Amino acid sequence: MEPLFGNTDNYRVLIRDKKGAYLLHPFISKTEKKFTIEQCSSIVSSTKYFAIINLGKLSLYSTKDCSLFKQFDDLEQVVAVHFSMNDKYLTVILKPAIEKNLKIFNLSNNFELINEFRSQTHPNNCWPQIKFSKDEKNIYFYNKTTLEIYDDKKNLINKFENILGYEDITFDNKHYFVASTFIIKNNGKKEYSFVLYDYQDLSKPSKVLNTSYTDRVKIKVSLDQKYVLFNAINDNPSNKSYYGQSNIYFFEITTSRFIKINLPEGPIHDFAFTPNGEHFIVCAGHLPSAVKLYKKNGLYEKDIAKGNFNTIKISPDSRFVALCGFGALKGDIEFYSLIDGALIGKNNFFCCVNFEWSQDSKYLLGSVLSTRVKVDNEYRIMKYNGEEVVVDKNVGEIYDCLFLYEEDENKIKYDEFNIEKNSKSLENKKKENTGGIKLTSTLGKIEFTNKGKEIPIDDGEIIGLGKKKKKKKHNKDNK
C-alpha cells in the first residue's frame, strides 16, 4: 500500500535565488522566513543545521526553528562548507589566497577550531576534502592523491601516497579503511589495486586486490559496513570509446571475496546500496541502459527495467526507486516498487538538476536550476509514484532548492539494517494513525497487509502496489 499522506504543513523548502535565501511551505507557496534580502552564494543543509554563505560571510542556522545559531564574523572569503555525518564537525573552505584555507570546527564544543590545512586543489576536484571516521575520532585529509589521517588532537597518525579514492569502515568494533591506489614500477608503468587497511596496523595493507587500469574511482559501502562496491573508471586515452571503460567490483570484507560484477557492455551510469543495506542497484550499458538489482552479498536477483536512464534515486525506506534520465537525456522518470518490482508511475522533468526524496519517502523534490539553464527555472514536488502535486515556475533564476530536514527523535531511524526492527516500528506507528495497518517482514523483504479498517486520508484513497504474493520457501541464498 502507498505511504499515508497526511498534514503537509511540516514540509519546508529552502530556496536561493536573486531575491535572496528564504524558507517556504511549498504546498501553499507561503514564504515563512527570509534570511537574506540580496543574492547569496550558497546554502548547505544537514540534519541539525543549515549554512548560508553571503558575501563571503558564513551564518549557521538551526533546522528546528530556523533561528541564527552562529555568525562566523572572524571568517572571510568563505566559498564552501561541509558537515560531518553526525553534525559534530563543520569544515569551512576559504579562498586559496588564505594561507590556511581549510578549517575544521567542533560544533558540539563551543565551535572550537580543532585543525586547519592548506588545500592545494579546488574542492570540486576531490569533495569533500575532509572526511571523518564513523566514530568521528579520526580525520581524513585528502589533497590531490595524498591521504593524511589525524586524530582529534591534531596528531598525524599516518600518511599515504598515490590514493585515488577511499572510504572509512567500522563494524563489530573493528576499524578499517578501503582505498584505490597505484604504484609506479621500475619500467615506469603503473600497477593499480584496491587495498584494505586495518587500524591495528596501518604500516601495510591487510588485503591487496589487483585490478585493471584506473583513472578515477567511486567507492560505496553498505549500511552494515561489510560490503564495498568499487567503480573503477578508465578514461581511455586511446580515444577508442567516448565513455572509456568502467567496471564494478564487489568486495566482502569478512570473507575477502572479491568479484567483478557482470554488466552489459558500456558505461556505468550510477550505482547505489539501498538505505536498509539489503540490496544494491546498478544502472549500466549503452542506451537504453539496463537497471539490475543485486543482493547485498553480490548475487544477482533480477532486472528492474531497461530505458534511457542514468540516475538512481532510492527512497529512504528502501521501498521505492525512481529511475531517471537527466543531464543530456530527455528527463524521463519511471517509478518502481522494490517490494514486488512493479512499475507504479511515470513522469518527465526535462533539464532537472536536483532530485531528492523527502525523509518520509512520500515525496520527491526536483528543480531546474540556473546552473543548467538561465530561463524557465522551476521546482516540482511529486508523490512516490510520480504524480505531481506542486509545480512552481520562477520568473527568474533559481540557484538552490532543497528540502529542509529537521532532527526528529520520533522519526523512524532508517540507519538500522535490521528490517524486522524497522517493520515493528512502522507497524506501531501505523496502528496509532490508521486503526491497524500491519507490516510484516519476510527474509529481508517487506510485505504490506491491511487488517484494520481503512479510514479516509487527505488524498481520499489508498492505492495498492500489487497483489500480495503467497509466501514461498526460500533457500539459503535468498536469506
Feature map (PLM): residue ranges:
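Residue position within the beta-strands of beta-propeller blades
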Residues: 15, 52, 92, 141, ...
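Conserved blade-ending motifs and adjacent loop-strand segments that build the rim/top face
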Residues: 307-310, 342-356, 388-402
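Beta-propeller blade signature
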Residues: 105-106, 192-199, 244-254, 337, ...
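A short beta-strand motif characteristic of beta-propeller blades
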Residues: 29-35, 67-72, 112-120, 155-160, ...
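Blade-terminus and WD-like Trp-Asp/Gly-His loop motifs, strongest in beta-propeller folds
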Residues: 3-10, 41-49, 80-89, 129-138, ...
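Terminal intrinsically disordered, low-complexity extensions flanking WD-repeat/beta-propeller proteins
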Residues: 375-479
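Beta-propeller domains
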Residues: 211-317
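Short, conserved, GDST-rich strand-edge loop motifs in beta-rich repeat architectures
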Residues: 181-188, 231-245, 367-377
